[in-house]
């Protein structure tokens, strides 16, 4: 619903609604519809210059000489929009992604944090991680356990291996995304075949065909860079990375996980370099993921707190004991660290939320917020709203006030809601009689935003009257 609303708002040029959807509802700015079009494309096509500038400033991608960039330029309704696309720095530079997980994977590839093997391709070094390559590619998993086993440096001198194409292949393995100059596409296809990456090969062939059709039908366009990007709901990357979490679980917590279908390839070695001990359970993990995703674990493992590590035993990795967390809750943290996802029941979400806050994991906090949003009803909405305020979960807080607006005529009779309004009023520093109350303002906003027909106007007025009557009865005028 939010995604379709975003596309409709971009076609209409409703900057306020788009800002609300991106900043309050966490809708992805580069989402695509069934016609492979982005919000930025519709804003350009419909001539909404202010909205185009806002989208670019908030991470919309429009790199020069790519399919998306050329499509936006060609479809732009006015010269000012075309100039904005050409002049804006994000047209020529990769934009900052809103997604914490994508940011992390890109940094992991570019910086080689805690890498354990270096590939040297015709003199160019690539610092990579055995665990990532093995989880993403059966070919690399096999080679790293046989021909390249135990090697910290792997030198590739074959004349058909292009270092530019090899770098693009690594980008795909780490991020699910690939950017390659059209002159190197054939080299990339050759590597994809060699590494048995059939999905990538299929995506490359389909993208080449689409770009060829676009260039042939749009005179004056020039696509120099081919971009492969998975659709938003594509689970392949996260499922592959979750394999590392499967392998990190201690035997006593695996349960039915290791029954058929067997999640780990036979003999797959994830090459863990850190062991977390939680209430007697040992989780064999990777510093690259924990340090890269959490400042808490970076301080624990990398900085001056490294004395917390216990020496390795019997050839295993060094161990760190974690306190104040149960194995079940840490399992949720584990899967989030590797795959950016974990199955959370609303009941478990409270415990995980507290730990996510302690471990400085805002993305996991958002997952907890989504789970808690599923349990909203008249009895729970005020309590969940308080939790959202406490842990600064803006989207969940907005969902709570949106739900409150729907049932406000019943909520005004509940003591917990009345107390929440009084506390909000008291929290406004030096509040004057006519100062607004944030909770009340948010409810009013959602009541008003639902009005689209004449019949809805009367219903909205009834809800607002119920709220105003409550405010008068408790001596608040705002």
UniProtKB/Swiss-Prot annotation:
GO terms for molecular function: translation elongation factor activity. GO terms for cellular component: cytoplasm; cytosol; nucleolus; plasma membrane; ubiquitin ligase complex. Residues 115-182, 272-346 form the BTB domain. It is found in: Cytoplasm. Pfam families: Ank_2, BTB. Ubiquitously expressed in all fetal tissues examined including heart, brain, liver, and kidney. Also expressed at lower levels in both adult heart and hypertrophic heart. The keyword Isomerase does not apply. Residues 451-477 form a coiled coil. ANK repeats lie at residues 1-31, 35-64. Its main location: cytoplasm. Keywords: ANK repeat, Coiled coil, Cytoplasm, Elongation factor, Protein biosynthesis, Repeat. The keyword Transcription regulation does not apply. May act as a mediator of the PTEN growth-suppressive signaling pathway. May play a role in developmental processes. This is Ankyrin repeat and BTB/POZ domain-containing protein 1. It comes from Homo sapiens (Human).
């Amino acid at each position: 619903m939010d995604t379709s609303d975003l596309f409709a708002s971009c076609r209409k040029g409703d900057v306020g609604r788009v800002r609300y959807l991106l900043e309050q509802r966490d809708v992805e700015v580069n989402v695509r519809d069934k016609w492979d079009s982005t919000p930025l494309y519709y804003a350009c096509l419909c001539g909404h210059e202010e909205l185009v500038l806002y989208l670019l400033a908030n991470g919309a991608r429009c790199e020069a000489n790519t399919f998306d960039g050329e499509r936006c330029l060609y479809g732009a309704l006015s010269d000012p929009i075309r100039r904005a696309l050409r002049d804006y720095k994000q047209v020529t530079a990769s934009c900052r992604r809103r997604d914490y997980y994508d940011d992390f994977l890109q940094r992991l590839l570019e910086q080689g944090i805690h890498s354990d093997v270096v590939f040297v391709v015709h003199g160019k070094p690539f610092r990579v991680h055995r665990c990532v390559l093995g989880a993403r590619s059966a070919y690399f998993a096999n080679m790293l356990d046989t021909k390249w086993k135990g090697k910290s440096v792997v030198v590739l001198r074959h004349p058909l291996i292009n270092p530019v194409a090899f770098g693009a292949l690594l980008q795909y393995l780490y991020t699910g995304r690939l950017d390659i100059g059209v002159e190197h596409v054939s080299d990339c296809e050759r590597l994809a075949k060699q590494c048995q990456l059939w999905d990538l090969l299929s995506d490359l062939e389909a993208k080449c065909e689409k770009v060829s059709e676009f260039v042939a039908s749009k005179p004056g366009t020039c696509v120099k860079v081919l971009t492969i990007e998975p659709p938003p709901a594509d689970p392949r990357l996260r499922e592959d990375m979750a394999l590392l979490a499967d392998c990190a679980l201690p035997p006593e917590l695996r349960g039915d996980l290791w029954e058929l279908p067997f999640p780990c390839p036979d003999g797959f070695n994830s090459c863990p370099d850190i062991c977390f001990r939680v209430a007697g359970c040992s989780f064999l993990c990777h510093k690259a993921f924990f340090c890269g995703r959490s400042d808490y674990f970076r301080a624990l493992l990398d900085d001056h707190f490294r004395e917390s590590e216990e020496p390795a035993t019997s050839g295993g990795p060094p161990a760190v004991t974690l306190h104040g967390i149960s194995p079940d809750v840490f399992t949720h943290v584990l899967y989030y660290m590797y795959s950016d996802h974990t199955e959370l029941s609303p009941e478990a979400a409270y415990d995980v939320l507290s730990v996510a806050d302690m471990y400085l994991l805002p993305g996991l906090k958002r997952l907890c917020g989504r789970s808690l949003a599923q349990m909203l009803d008249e009895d729970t909405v005020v309590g969940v709203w308080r939790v959202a305020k406490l842990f600064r979960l803006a989207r969940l807080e907005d969902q709570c006030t949106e739900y409150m607006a729907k049932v406000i005529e019943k909520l005004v009779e509940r003591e917990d809601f009345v107390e929440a309004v009084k506390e909000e009023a008291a929290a406004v520093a030096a509040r004057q009689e006519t100062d607004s109350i944030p909770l009340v303002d948010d409810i009013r906003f959602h009541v008003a935003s639902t009005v689209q027909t004449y019949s809805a106007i009367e219903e909205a007025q009834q809800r607002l009257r119920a709220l105003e009557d409550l405010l008068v009865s408790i001596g608040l005028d705002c």
